[in-house]
Amino acid sequence: MLTKLSLRNAGRTWKDYLVFFVTLVLIAAIMFSFNGLLFDPDIRTLETDSYIIAVMLGIATFFILLVLAWLIQYMIRFMMKKRSREFATYLLLGMKRRQITHIFWGESLALGAMAFLLGTIIGLFLRQFLFACFYTLIGKSYRLDFSWNTPSFLMTLLCFFSCYLLALLFHQKKFRGMNIAGLVRADRENECIREGNLITGAATSLAGIAYFVIFGTVLYFKGGSLDNDDIIRMIVLLILSIYLLYWGLASLFSLYLKKRGKRIYHGTNLFLIRQLSSKIRTMRFTFGTLTVLFTLSLLGCSLALMLNQYQNTQLIYKYPFSVSILGNASSTMESEQATINGLSPDAVTHVYKVYHNGGEQMRTYYLTHLRAFAKYGGNPDNGPGGGASASVDSLISMPDGIWAQYYNHDPFMRLSDYNALRRMLGFPEAGLPEGGYLLQTKYRLLKELGDDVYQVTVPAGGSELYLAGIYTDAFCQDGHNGSDYILVADDDVVEQMEVYYTELASMIPGTLSDEQIGAIYSSHTDYSDIIASGTDTMTLTITDTLISQELLAEGKWGYTSISLPMVYIGLVYLCVALTILSVQQLSDSGKYRYHCQLLSSLGLRRKQINRTLLKQMSWFYLCPILPAVLISGMAVIIISGKFVNATGVSGSAFTYFGTSFFIFVGIYLLYFIAAYVGFVRDVWKE
């Protein structure tokens, strides 16, 4: 009998809380598909460091389970409160508390089981889309595979129902202590509103807003110099300020009403302000939590887009040659070249020397002008629009460790070698006027070089060479063809200099096997001890032998392992937050039925009342979303600016945040429309 009653109630519950049920289905589907990445045997064989994605997805799953458990316990508490009179009726009919507990447990688990099974079925198809995206991101091909993954299913089952059981156990004590009088009063608790001190509440809200401004200002001006402890403290204070905002926001509305602002009696504003103020006061902690979830969702998706653009554009820029090998000055690279030619007769290989004349003029200029060296005594304001240039005739004082980023002397390359490499990469040849030299540098550094870079002359062949042009094409400049930069001069001028090191660059058509890659590594035994690193921070490989196929695969794998969990967390957090908003609004349809009847008695037509309900729902939905959009938008604008400067990608804040916001709005509108249609239908139900 109790089982039959539980199943009947479960069938009714999923209809009454359809948005909650659909969200559980979506979370189960998303979780099942992402868990497939953890346990798929083919993925584990793609990379030797496949554990990276397992670790990142494990961390993402942990944070998702926290929010999922919060959602389920919130909804269980919410349903217990809304059905308190029903439980009181059961007690009046002579049921024991233990029996009521079994009924509620049974229907809750039945609802979860239905959502889980349906989500698993949908997850089988969602898994194909996810795997196709994943393989595309790492540069592999994927064929549809609907095979059943038992470990993935068991992992999802364990995570999903662990959250359910924890949420039910959390409320077990309430069932034991319930009584008829308490249950009858329970569904009226939200109506007991304490206004408290309005001035204190308003000041609390304004303090939260003030910290938002402080947070953005500090992040903009000091973001690059903050250490980890400072960042953690700022984030903790930001979360606290979000809760402070909602803790006193209702007081601001109340003060506005007491002062009888000009817009109070315009249309239905009085009704709307009172409803929103009441809702904020009873849900201020929930609103704060929802704002945090919305903020994390937008930030996570925006950061994932940044990483995705970086891996798609900058990795190939860093490693344009199929193979780059660095050797000592005396190295001939005969063994390496013979190995490459043996592996691929169509390979185009060029061996050349890099020289130096003992000068440090351009190196000094970089050290005194790049932002990367500002904290060591450089002056980044000497760039475009900055103040007077620092002297390029003497080195600034630097810690010993900083020299490893650049060679001790300016590296030079012959013009013939430079053009040979440009032809290999498909670039047009560079011209050079007599008495001049070229600067080959990274694109991201160009904006940090001032116009005074053209004043930097370098001694060579008994004369001073002037800067005739700057090139920023992809050129493998993390220590091989210079570190961040290399100078190019006429062959007869450069050949008078001292040989610095030997370099081999090769373009190999097709794909190399693991055995071929191993053979190339084994062929190089004359290891160099003079390699520099440059100033890149996102991806940096300091080694004599660079094989682009391997480095691109590792880079794409690593960044995809970070970006996909961010999207995973963002989608789940967004759905959870919108579910809370929708269920809260739909549950009030009974109360609003009376309000609508009152408005109708005052002369408002049904169309006007529906418009008022639309405004009320819009305000209710926007209340936790607007602060999240402002905070995340401000953070993304600042972070993306620093990201573009640090990596050289051509994106902007609009590219990252705009795309995330577009996806956010799309999902938001689906939930909002579904909630509005259901709300209006329930309000006018006879």
Question: How should these model regions be labeled?
Answer:
Residues 1-28, 192-207, 247-297, 591:
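N-terminal Sec/SRP start-transfer signal
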Residues 29-59, 133, 231-232, 241, ...:
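Alpha-helical transmembrane segments
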Residues 28-40, 74-78, 110-140, 152-177, ...:
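Small-residue-rich transmembrane alpha-helices
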Residues 14-20, 104-122, 157, 195-205, ...:
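Selective transmembrane-helix segments that form parts of the transport pathway or gating/packing helices
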Residues 15-22, 33-63, 79-81, 89, ...:
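Peri-transmembrane interface segments
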Residues 72-82, 174, 251-265, 575-602, ...:
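Juxtamembrane interface at the cytosolic side of transmembrane helices
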Residues 315-560:
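Nucleotide-cofactor and metal-assisted catalytic machinery
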